[in-house]
């Protein structure tokens, strides 16, 4: 099987209703990353100094050396920036992404976080890059991070965010069974569920755009006013749409500088001036989402073996299980676990088939109100479809008219008249009969194939979401 693991469909065109508390139009979620004292440093057993997210844009790591200037920039975040932000945000729900070793080196800051009632989620053991870390090393660090976090704060973390993660991170976090949510994703404006083995893991996605890290990156913000404008524009769009979540990422050593902190203060005033704004921690959002939208597992088409797939979807195209068999061999993924997605895969096989094969599918369809219907020998799907348009309750005159049209159509084109009856009533079907009898064969063959595909979509919508 060719299977593509990435989910490119998510909540789709119509996201679920968030139903935020108090009928809020938007949930605003502020994250304060506490990393100072957990960054790369040979004092921490690392091979080199830190080089990421500081005032020294483009800095390089110094192998085997301490970087005095870099260390002092991080120290500013703990010594001054944190307290400026604490004074500003103490009355708001905030989630701290706390590096466990940094928390252990900042007991006064931890006490202040707890006094403010902030959530302290885990940001890992050390603030290092795990993209090349062996899986067993990353797992061991995660376990130690949970242990140390619990030891330092008194309670285990309910949320996890590595940041500089690996392809294994989300799976490893889910496998702990520890977390109400994992935040190592930027894939959506709303929480969503992922299935990892036997674990149903809620993802509360984070942000790298509404994030003060862009003060320390090329093409980022170089003044507080730019950050403020971006936050306000993001807020306005999400507020207008309604039922959305706005995450804001902050770092003590970045937004904690006085020339930037003012932008944050002004944004908070701006957001609070609106009605229907719910400031919340990430754990509050996770609890709300889990209660409002508990996960329900389904038999996902992309995860079925060939026999089960064909048994389930082989009748979507009338009497043509070969189409389902062909679709199973395509590259399928989460995007094909919806009615529209699987429909596309099945139609690809149908459209790519030769003329004789497609004509065979057309001829597998019964006449409308024909002899098979009278003998009750239609498939269950065809029976229900014809009944939906009242074709199972025709008068003698109506039945005679249908049979005459069927005969004329078959004589002209060489295949039965096919129409997605769920889109029509009896009068609409008869009008389509008359109109389509005027087509040339090529035009009508194309239209009949479109109707076959439309029938398949209706059948799939009765079986799958969206």
Q: How should these model regions be labeled?
A:
Residues 320-321, 417:
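Residue-level signal for inorganic ion chemistry
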Residues 297-315:
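Charged, compositionally biased N-terminal leader segments and the immediate start
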Residues 204, 217-229, 233, 395:
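A mid-sequence, solvent-exposed acidic-amphipathic segment
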Residues 315, 321-405, 455-464:
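Aromatic-anchored, charged helix-turn/loop surface patch used as a conserved interaction hotspot
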Residues 2-202, 227-248, 254-296:
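Catalytic alpha-helical scaffold of carbohydrate-active enzymes acting on polysaccharides/glycoconjugates
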Residues 394, 398-466:
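C-terminal non-catalytic interaction appendages of large macromolecular assemblies
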Residues 196-215:
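A structural motif
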Residues 84, 140, 144, 230-233, ...:
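A non-catalytic, amphipathic alpha-helix used as a structural packing/dimerization or gating element
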């Amino acid at each position: 099987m060719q299977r593509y693991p990435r989910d490119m469909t998510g909540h789709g065109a119509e996201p679920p209703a968030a139903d935020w508390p108090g009928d809020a139009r938007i949930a605003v979620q502020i994250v304060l990353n506490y990393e100072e004292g957990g960054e790369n440093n040979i004092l921490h057993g690392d091979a080199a100094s830190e080089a990421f997210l500081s005032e020294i844009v483009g800095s390089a790591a110094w192998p085997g050396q301490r970087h005095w200037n870099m260390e002092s920039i991080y120290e500013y975040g703990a010594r001054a920036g944190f307290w400026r932000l604490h004074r500003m945000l103490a009355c708001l729900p905030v989630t701290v992404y706390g590096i466990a070793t940094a928390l252990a080196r900042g007991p006064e800051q931890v006490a202040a976080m707890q006094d403010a009632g902030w959530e302290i989620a885990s940001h890992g053991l050390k603030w290092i890059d795990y993209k090349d870390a062996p899986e067993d090393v990353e797992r061991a660090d995660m376990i130690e991070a949970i242990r140390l976090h619990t030891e330092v704060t008194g309670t285990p973390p309910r949320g996890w965010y590595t940041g500089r993660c690996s392809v294994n991170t989300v799976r490893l976090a889910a496998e702990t069974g520890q977390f109400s949510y994992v935040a190592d994703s930027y894939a959506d404006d709303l929480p969503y569920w992922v299935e990892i083995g036997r674990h149903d893991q809620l993802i509360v996605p984070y942000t790298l755009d509404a994030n003060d890290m862009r003060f320390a990156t090329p093409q980022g913000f170089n003044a507080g006013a730019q950050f403020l404008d971006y936050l306000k524009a993001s807020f306005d769009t999400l507020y207008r749409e309604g039922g959305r979540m706005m995450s804001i990422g902050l770092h003590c050593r970045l937004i904690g500088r006085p020339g930037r902190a003012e932008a944050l203060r002004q944004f908070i005033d701006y957001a609070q001036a609106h009605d229907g704004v719910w400031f919340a921690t990430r754990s509050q959002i996770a609890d709300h989402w889990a209660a409002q939208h508990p996960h329900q597992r389904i038999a996902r088409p992309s995860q079925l073996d060939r026999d089960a797939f064909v048994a389930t979807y082989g009748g979507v195209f009338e009497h043509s299980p070969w189409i389902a068999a062909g679709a199973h061999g395509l590259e399928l993924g989460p995007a094909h676990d919806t009615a529209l997605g699987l429909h596309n895969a099945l139609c690809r096989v149908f459209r790519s088939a030769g003329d004789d094969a497609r004509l065979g599918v057309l001829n597998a369809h019964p006449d409308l109100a024909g002899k098979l219907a009278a003998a009750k020998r239609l498939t269950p799907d065809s029976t229900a479809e014809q009944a939906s348009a009242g074709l199972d309750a025709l008068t003698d005159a109506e039945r005679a008219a249908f049979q005459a049209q069927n005969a004329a159509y078959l004589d002209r084109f060489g295949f039965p008249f096919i129409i997605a009856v769920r889109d029509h009533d009896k009068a609409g079907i008869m009008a389509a009969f008359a109109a389509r009898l005027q087509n040339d064969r090529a035009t009508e063959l194309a239209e009949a194939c479109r109707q076959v595909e439309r029938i398949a979509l209706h059948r799939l919508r009765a079986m799958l979401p969206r």
